[in-house]
Amino acid sequence: MVAYYHDNTLLHESEILQIMENQLLHTPDGVRDIYNGECKKKLYLQDKLHRTLLKYGYHDIMTPTFEFFNIFGSDVGTTPSKDLYKFFDKEGNTLVLRPDFTPSIARSAAKYYIEDDMPVKLCYLGNTFINSSDYQGRLKESTQCGAELIGDGSISADAEILSMTVESMLESGLKNFQISVGHSQFFYGLTKAAGLSGEQEENLRELIANKNFFGVEEFVDSLSMNDKLRKLFGLLDNFDLQDEQLMEALKLAKGYDEILSSIDTLLKLREYLKAYGIEKYISYELGLISDYTYYTGIIFQGYTYGTGEPIVKGGRYDKLLSHFGKDAAAIGFAIVVDQLMAALSRQDIDVPVIENYSLIVFDEAAYHAAIKRSMELRRDGVNTQMVLKDKNKTKEDYASYAVDNRINRVEFIEE
């Protein structure tokens, strides 16, 4: 009997053949097929989200599914190298499947809008690929729909992006969701004021990312600092800071420029958001941090019931385009469509797909009549499927087939 090693395990030939047979039918971990009703709902939802972005005057852009490795290199501040899908072209260049739309669009904007000094508003829809094994069941290929506002560093631009985010969530059918807004410079300012080393900063970042605020408290207690700074560190575990708390934080931040500026920006942002009437969907969280280090201003994440992952994320990145040769402020966001679909399903919120399908079942002698009828229906906007009648099938069989495939009506055309 022949034996082989597979994934460092000794297997017999019959077991290897079974593995190969399974791989013919099954997808790799982290990717999945989407078909029938679920596929229709996803396409409908994507179209609705996309139309919401267009309403704000954004223009479509498509970037390549794969790019050169340095577009997503460590100096860019995006997905870690270990989580990238990397491969080589014939010339030996390292290529990467797109893990994040923002660097791709920043590169594209720097190339095609290098001389523009007016705002550029771009939106997109496509898939991203992250080879992460941190969480069992997490998709490694996911669909994102998002927008980028380039060339506008104002707080009004921040407010517009947040308004688009909220309106997109409402258009999807969600009613109960919250957009947590923070500022990247608050965390940076704290670590700078406390004189933390790179290792200490990374330890603190990990504690906050894991929501381990007992660990944060213990970490802060081990440091020597004044009372004002200690109180500012104490705000890291508050997920919904009110006006008076932000005003108090502003007083404590005097003397710490980055911290002061970040809190002042959030207070001003609140006033802009009132004009859009979306305050009830916004909360302020100074402990909010992002895995992406290219953010320089506000950052935000959207949450709802039925999913532990953010359904939307975004922020301001005023230095990223300079990496590609264009000095321009920018802000953007991405809706994770798959997470949004999961949330809608778990909250029993229906995606109202309109079915308009017809089935023409015909026998051989009625072929020309069936063609004529199907063409009439298609001209009228009805999605029409033709099936040659099988003498072993009954009309009830075809009616059942229509129900299973969400076909509204069945017509039988016989000679």
Positions of the model-derived regions?
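Acidic, His- and aromatic-enriched active-site or binding-groove loops in soluble protein domains
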Residues: 83-89, 196-216
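Short, surface-exposed recognition loops or helix-turn segments adjacent to catalytic cores
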Residues: 176-186, 204, 283-287
